[in-house]
């Protein structure tokens, strides 16, 4: 299902005054959006598309074959334009922007989309975006972050692709409350759904335990965001072998609570170039085949997902 359907639903209900009038009644967002009580709704979401050609090659057949539900592309990266053209030619697919403020690889780097002079705090001594989130947090103002994420959205629109949603690469936009504020502000200004999680006490505890600085101020910003949210969020687990990776993924699926859960992964086809970019290449190659694996498809169907 395209995120655009969710935003149309949300826009249609926002003028109503009460939760009952809005139809937003239920214990989780799956129920609020009309799924039967107790439903486990999973969004399989491909991240880091546009980062390299190998990522594009992996994501496109997944989407065309309806084996995954959505993907998000990195505007500053060299292969974004190619994927944007593909998205324009395949409007039925849910393609968003993976708003990117870091450039994490050792030798494969990129800089900002906006004028570097306007975002000096986002740029490391080598002239690229910072390797790690902490570099952004320690140097970039919220104003600089807002300039850059809006430049990325504008770049996509100028190429002819209006994204179906936006989310955040490496969680950077959740690393400071003022970053989260400009993220949601951009989402509302452009009328593009942002990936957001319903911050129940259990979810807050989970993400704080993972090292995310979820402050009360950030929770307030999330609560004020009026479009539909996720109930939980996961990454496809790593494994020492493909079989182990699949087995751990099955355990994750069986552990899900009712509601809408997004599970992200980073598919790429195997090449020597990919191996030179990232030492996580093997996990990415496995993730490029696991969701077309008949055993995985059968398992998901058996779980009612």
Segments (PLM) and residue ranges:
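A short alpha/beta connector and helix-capping loop motif
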Residues: 53-77
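C-terminal domain-boundary segment and adjacent tail
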Residues: 194-195, 277-305
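Catalytic domains of cell-wall/extracellular-matrix polysaccharide-remodeling enzymes
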Residues: 142-227, 239-245, 254
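Bacterial Sec-dependent N-terminal signal peptides
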Residues: 1-23
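Structural preference for beta-strand elements that scaffold enzyme active sites
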Residues: 41-43, 68-72, 92-98, 163-167, ...
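Substrate-binding cleft of extracellular glycoside hydrolase catalytic domains
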Residues: 92-150
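N-terminal pre-catalytic segment of deacetylase/amide-hydrolase enzymes
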Residues: 16-43
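Acidic (Asp/Glu)-rich catalytic clusters
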Residues: 32-34, 59-65, 82-94, 111-124, ...
């Amino acid at each position: 299902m395209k995120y655009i359907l969710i935003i149309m639903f949300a826009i249609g209900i926002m003028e109503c005054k009460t939760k009952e009038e809005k139809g937003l009644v239920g214990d989780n967002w799956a129920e609020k959006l009309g799924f039967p009580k107790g439903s486990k709704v999973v969004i399989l979401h491909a991240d880091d598309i546009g980062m390299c050609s190998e990522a594009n090659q992996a994501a496109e057949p997944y989407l065309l074959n309806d084996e995954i539900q959505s993907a998000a592309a990195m505007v500053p990266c060299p292969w974004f334009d190619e994927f944007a053209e593909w998205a324009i030619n395949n409007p039925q697919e849910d393609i968003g922007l993976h708003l990117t403020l870091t450039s994490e690889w050792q030798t494969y780097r990129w800089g900002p989309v906006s004028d570097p002079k306007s975002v000096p705090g986002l740029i490391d001594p080598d002239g690229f975006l910072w390797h790690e989130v902490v570099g952004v947090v320690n140097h970039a103002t919220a104003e600089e972050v807002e300039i850059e994420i809006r430049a990325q959205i504008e770049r996509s629109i100028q190429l002819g692709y209006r994204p179906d949603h936006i989310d955040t690469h490496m969680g950077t936009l959740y690393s400071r409350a003022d970053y989260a504020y400009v993220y949601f502000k951009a989402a509302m200004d452009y009328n593009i759904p942002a990936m957001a999680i319903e911050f129940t006490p259990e979810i807050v505890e989970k993400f704080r335990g993972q090292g995310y600085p979820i402050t009360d101020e950030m929770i307030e910003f999330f609560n004020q965001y009026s479009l539909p949210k996720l109930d939980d969020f996961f990454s496809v687990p790593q494994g020492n072998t493909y079989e182990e990776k699949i087995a751990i993924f099955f355990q994750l699926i069986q552990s899900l609570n009712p509601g809408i859960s997004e599970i992200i992964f980073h598919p790429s086809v195997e090449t020597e170039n990919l191996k030179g970019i990232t030492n996580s290449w093997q996990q990415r190659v496995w993730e490029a085949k696991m969701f077309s694996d008949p055993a995985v498809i059968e398992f998901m169907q058996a779980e009612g997902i």
